[in-house]
Amino acid sequence: MTDTSGKNKIVFVPGKNPKPQPQAHRALLWRCLLRGLELVDPAIARTIAAQPASFVLVSWNKLFYGEEKEADEDQPWIEALCHKSGPDAADVREALSWRNKLARFLYLVADHLPFLIPLLPDPAVKSAVVESERYFHDHDGVGAQVREAVKTPLREMLAAGDRILLIGHSMGSIIAYDALWELDHVEHNPARIDLLLTLGSPLGMHYVQDQLLGFRDRDGRRFPCNIRRWVNVAAHGDLTALDPELRGHFGAMLEGGCTGSIEDRYQEVFTYFRNELGLNAHRSYGYLVEAHTARAIAAWWLGADEAACCPADGSALAMPG
C-alpha cells in the first residue's frame, strides 16, 4: 500500500450558528477528530496528529452571522465527550425516544408541505429555515461569499494535486455541495476531490434540494461531477438529517459518472455529545468522535479498503513504514 499522506488534506465546512474564533474552533474540532480516530485505530490517529497542517477549517460563520461565540461554552462538554469511548444506554434511549420519533414525523410532513413549517413547535427548525433562505437567496451576496470561502482553499489544493477529503456538517454540507457545483459547472475546473463526507446533512430534504445549484436542471449540469466518492453519516435522533438515505435522491450521479459511489451510513449510528440541555445528536463534535465517521476518515487517509484498515471489531492494519 502506498503512503500518500503527505498530499492528504482534510477540509472541514462547519454547520450553522456562530462559532468560536477560528483558531479555537479548529482546536476543538481537531481534538474530537483525533479522539474518534484513537478509538478505531490509535496508530492512524498518531500519524494524522503529527500532521496538523493537513486539517483546514473553512470559517464562514462570522461572515454570515457577523459574530462569534466563546469557545469556553463547549470546552467542558467536549472534554466529557472525549472521555467516553462510545454511546451509553441513556444516549441510545434518548436518541430513539418517542419524542424524537414524533418530531421526525412532523418534520417529514412539513418537508413535503413547506407552508406548515411556521407551525412547527421547535424554534430551532424555524431559525434554520430562515438562515438557509438567506443563503439560498443570496441576500447581500452572502451565499456567494460563503461558497468562495470554501472554493479558495479547494482551488489551491486541487491545483497542487492534493488528495482532498471535504467534510460538510449540517448546513456546511449544503455549502460544500454548491461550491463543488460551481467549481465544476461555472469555473470548469477539471479536478476532483477524493471524498465528500457529509455529517448530519439536510441534503435529503426536498425543501433543500429544490434550492441547490443546478438541481432543477435536467441536463449535464444538474449535479457536481467532481466527487470520486461520497459517504454520508446520519445519527439516530438527528432531526436535521431528516432523510438519511441520500443515495435515493442523488443516485443519478452514479449513472452520470459524477461520482463512483454514494454510501449512506445510519444504521446503528449514535452520537453522544451532551451539554446542559442533554443529548444533542446533531453537534459536529459528536459526529467527529463517532466510529462510522472515524473509520471513513482513517481509511481515506491510508487510501485503503475500510474493512482492512479499521474494521468494526477494533483490529487494525499496520501503518505503512
Model-identified regions with their sequence ranges:
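Lipid deacylating catalytic domains
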Residues: 1-60, 65-69, 107-167, 173-321
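N-terminal accessory regions of S-adenosyl-L-methionine
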Residues: 60-62, 67-94
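Low-complexity, serine/threonine/proline-enriched polar segments
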Residues: 81-116
